[in-house]
Amino acid sequence: MTLLFPAAWTLTMECQGASATFEIAPPNRVEVVAETYESLPLWNPNGWCFTKGFRLFGVRAMECSVAYALEQGSLRVETSEGRTLVEGTDYQFDSVWASIGLLEGGAATSDTPLLLSYAYRQQRIDTVVRLPDGSLSLVQGASDTVLPVPPKIEQGTPIANIYVDGRTSALSDENVFPIEANLASRDDEKPAPATVPKAAERLPKTYQKLLSGESVTILAWGDSVTETTYITDPEDRWQMQFLRRLEKRFPKAKITLVSVGWGGRTTTAFLNEPSGSPHNYQEKVLDAKPDLVVSEFINDSGLFKDQAAFEAQYGRILRDFQERGIEWAILTPHYSRCDWMGLTSQKHCDDDPRPYVAYLREFAKTHPVLLADAAHRWGHLWREGIPHETLLVNNINHPNPQGLSFFADALMKEFE
């Protein structure tokens, strides 16, 4: 595939003998005029990202805001009497996260209604399709502030997605996501077909119980992505998606699922909780006496200073499980927003840069655990035409139901 950009919003694409030039619409601009805010908090300079102040309504994501969606310099703050407030004197503002707070001594107090005007740009995914006659055609997607999706294709084969967001001022290679194949891994990375599922080797007791139609208790243990209170339908949680597919794979088995999730926390937080806490490791995980623990901890990604520290903690957990006859499947974490991972692009990101993921993969090679490598799928999404940040409902690190399904995919791959 050859790409040329003869003008800011013009794309010429050549692919397998076909060529076409498309005019791509810039990101949709939304202008908000005199939006009422009954009260604003004081600015907190020590806050985290969007928590320094109050999030503008128009650019909100679930629990957070959409970074870089706001048009720089567009904010105007006025009182109901028409007085314009001054940034740095009356209020402070984070233009990346669209978060605003009042300053002490300014013209407004927390009970002063204010009118805010601003503009922001939405995200969109368009798709280039090869039609039955071999020609190329562009199908425009719908604009969305947080979760744009590719358009529905009525005919033809999608060959590339074009992604634009608030930071896109002109098209480049970064905006074009070729769809290499509708597969979960590259052909050159496909392992040889296994005669025995890896779960049978790594989780022998659990696997045999499933196969024999016995009762099996599975405990899903993790952070907010396991607790998943942000998902409207509990059936969309990764562990529920896994359960349904596991029941289909082993229809005679009697599977009980227990979920132990704690938003914003790590394995260390669980280990340090006192007796009687709803998140005490001993009482809620070990004493539940599951046959299998499946753990998911993206929050552990920044927890360990080196592999030795990781080995000490995960080795302790493994010993605790082994002493009680509990088997362990470990999920590698999904991708979060690029700047949290040390990535500079949502493309060419197959190799997960997080040391934690490397620690997990090495741990699974040398210890009797099952690794379900969801991170591998997330690193491959750009090859499927999917910018991975468009699957994060909070624009940071909470996957939508499709993103959660990749955990179930990674697990079932090892059971089939």
Regions found by a protein language model. Give the residues of each.
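Catalytic His-Asp segment of secreted/periplasmic serine-dependent ester chemistry enzymes
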Residues: 199, 334-416
